[in-house]
């Protein structure tokens, strides 16, 4: 049943079928034209599907069974930290005092929620080594943009209008150069060396009086710790630039190392990744930004403060970059992250990193004989393989990813980072058991052997899914975004 094709909800529709009946009107009827201008009133009825409640329940249940999520199976998507989301988080987020409040309520009536937000900020300050944190940004890339706007405001306040360039490594997340561009900067690429780390000599070459910031993920997207980070920070700071920390890989250093101690001036976090907010379905996320003291004046307003009279939002921020989101951030995700941090404690967070790193290194060593290992050294929370040897036999990394679907696994991240040919990036996270890891590894080994003995099986995969291979070029260039009702059959 899971792999059967599913009709569109419009195709299930039958004229006259009713899903829900409204009770008889017991108040005076109000005509739409008495309330709305004619421009806002439909001339024709909306073409909505006519289905029963049972039809719609079966339809969406069937669709949900075709989805893959952390609760249904292993999800080794590199640089995405698809860890299990503890269900206690959901219970706490549904407390009436959190779920039934509104951001326009008087501050005096939501002191408990504000206390949670303030305490969460304090925990994140301790975890990152920053001086303060704002919870306003909605997700990772939004946090990146916010952090870069803070850096821009800082430089402009100091009269440094010529600092128009942001440096990113060739292994950087794609959102880094995108966020820099949206924030009004020009992106400059710094190369990696033969060890997969930022090339210090190339960094010295590109850093100058026009440098606004260097954006880094540490460990980087290859899963390798930038061991020269203190020297890199000195190079950037001596040139008058700022050091930005992309928190996508914070799961690798929790309670082990802090960005603030490495010399970073700004950090964004992904609460929906590192701190177990559910993600993968389009949102919501949460991307708090932490800063050092000299950037505090520019934080988006309002900022949450604690006084002897309780908690309040301070809007008196003349140098602030303004708001970056309505209200105060994605509160529900913040509740979940707070619950996770309090449940784990410092020792638990330290164990998170230890098991995440252990799992990644175990998988890397077991798979290394069957796939190319571009950087043969200890990794952190994730690692990168290459399908170069499989490509020589006519099988691409894309084919390997499609074959994994036949075994019920979500594929790893592929073709990223861009500086590794036929890249396969795997992040197991700390929440997976050895048995789960071994099951995935065994299938990866099986696929490697199939490439050598029967490559057509891999080249033509997937074989068991409802949808085989999409025409991705056509889907991108000519997407079908609306249902077109079939024309009446001419008799």
Curated annotation (Swiss-Prot):
A Pfam short name: GDC-P
Catalysis performed (reactions): N(6)-[(R)-lipoyl]-L-lysyl-[glycine-cleavage complex H protein] + glycine + H(+) = N(6)-[(R)-S(8)-aminomethyldihydrolipoyl]-L-lysyl-[glycine-cleavage complex H protein] + CO2
Keyword Cell cycle (UniProt): no
One of the GO biological process terms: glycine decarboxylation via glycine cleavage system
CDD domains registered for this protein in UniProt: GDC-P
GO CC terms, sorted: cytosol; glycine cleavage complex
A Gene Ontology molecular function term of the record: glycine binding
Cofactors that this protein relies on: pyridoxal 5'-phosphate
Modified-residue entries (N6-(pyridoxal phosphate)lysine), positions: 273
Broad class of enzyme this protein falls into: oxidoreductase
InterPro entries membership: GcvPB (IPR023012), GDC-P_C (IPR049316), GDC-P_N (IPR049315), GDC_P (IPR020581), PyrdxlP-dep_Trfase (IPR015424), PyrdxlP-dep_Trfase_major (IPR015421), PyrdxlP-dep_Trfase_small (IPR015422)
EC id: 1.4.4.2
UniProt keyword terms in alphabetical order: Oxidoreductase, Pyridoxal phosphate
Role this protein plays: The glycine cleavage system catalyzes the degradation of glycine. The P protein binds the alpha-amino group of glycine through its pyridoxal phosphate cofactor; CO(2) is released and the remaining methylamine moiety is then transferred to the lipoamide cofactor of the H protein.
Subunit composition and interactions: The glycine cleavage system is composed of four proteins: P, T, L and H. In this organism, the P 'protein' is a heterodimer of two subunits.
Homology family: Belongs to the GcvP family. C-terminal subunit subfamily.
Protein name, per record: Probable glycine dehydrogenase (decarboxylating) subunit 2
Source species: Bacillus cereus (strain B4264)
């Amino acid at each position: 049943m899971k792999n059967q094709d599913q009709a569109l909800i419009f195709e299930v529709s039958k004229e006259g079928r009713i899903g829900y009946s409204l009770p008889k009107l017991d108040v005076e009827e109000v005509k739409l034209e008495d309330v709305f201008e004619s421009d806002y009133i439909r001339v024709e009825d909306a073409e909505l599907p006519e289905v029963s409640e049972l039809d719609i329940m079966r339809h969406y249940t069937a669709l949900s069974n075709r989805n893959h999520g952390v609760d249904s199976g292993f999800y080794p998507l590199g640089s995405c930290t698809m860890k299990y989301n503890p269900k206690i988080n959901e219970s706490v987020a549904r407390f009436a005092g959190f779920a039934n409040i509104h951001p326009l309520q008087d501050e005096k009536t939501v002191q408990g929620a504000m206390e949670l937000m303030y305490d969460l900020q304090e925990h994140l300050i301790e975890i990152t080594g920053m001086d303060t944190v704002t919870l306003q940004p909605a997700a990772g890339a939004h946090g990146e943009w916010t952090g870069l706007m803070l850096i821009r405001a800082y430089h402009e306040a100091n009269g440094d209008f010529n600092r128009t360039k942001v440096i990113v490594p060739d292994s950087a997340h794609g959102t880094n150069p995108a966020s820099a561009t949206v924030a009004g900067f020009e992106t400059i690429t710094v190369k990696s060396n033969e060890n997969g780390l930022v090339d210090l000599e190339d960094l010295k070459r590109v850093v100058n009086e026009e440098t606004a910031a260097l954006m880094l993920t540490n460990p980087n997207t290859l899963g390798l710790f930038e061991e020269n980070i203190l020297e890199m920070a000195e190079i950037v700071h001596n040139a008058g630039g700022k050091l930005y920390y992309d928190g996508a890989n914070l799961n690798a250093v929790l309670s082990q190392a802090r960005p603030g101690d490495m010399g970073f001036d700004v950090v964004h976090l992904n609460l929906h990744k590192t701190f177990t907010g559910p993600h993968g379905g389009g949102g919501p996320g949460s991307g708090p930004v932490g800063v050092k003291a000299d950037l505090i004046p520019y934080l988006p307003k309002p900022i949450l403060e604690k006084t002897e009279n309780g908690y309040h939002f301070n809007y008196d921020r003349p140098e602030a970059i303004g708001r970056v989101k309505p209200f105060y951030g994605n509160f529900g995700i913040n509740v979940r992250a707070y619950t996770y941090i309090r449940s784990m404690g410092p020792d638990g967070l330290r164990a998170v990193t230890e098991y995440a790193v252990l799992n990644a290194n175990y998988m890397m060593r077991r798979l290394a004989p069957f796939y190319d290992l571009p950087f043969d050294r200890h990794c952190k929370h994730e690692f990168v393989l290459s399908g170069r040897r499989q490509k020589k036999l006519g099988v691409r990394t894309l084919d390997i990813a499609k074959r994994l679907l036949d075994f019920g696994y979500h594929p790893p991240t592929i073709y990223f980072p861009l500086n590794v040919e036929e890249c396969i990036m795997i992040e197991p996270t700390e929440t997976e058991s050895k048995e789960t890891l071994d099951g995935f590894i065994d299938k990866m080994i099986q696929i490697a052997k199939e490439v050598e003995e029967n490559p057509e099986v891999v080249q033509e995969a997937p074989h068991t899914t409802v949808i085989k291979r999409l025409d991705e070029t056509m889907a991108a260039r000519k997407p079908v975004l609306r249902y077109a009702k079939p024309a009446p059959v001419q008799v």
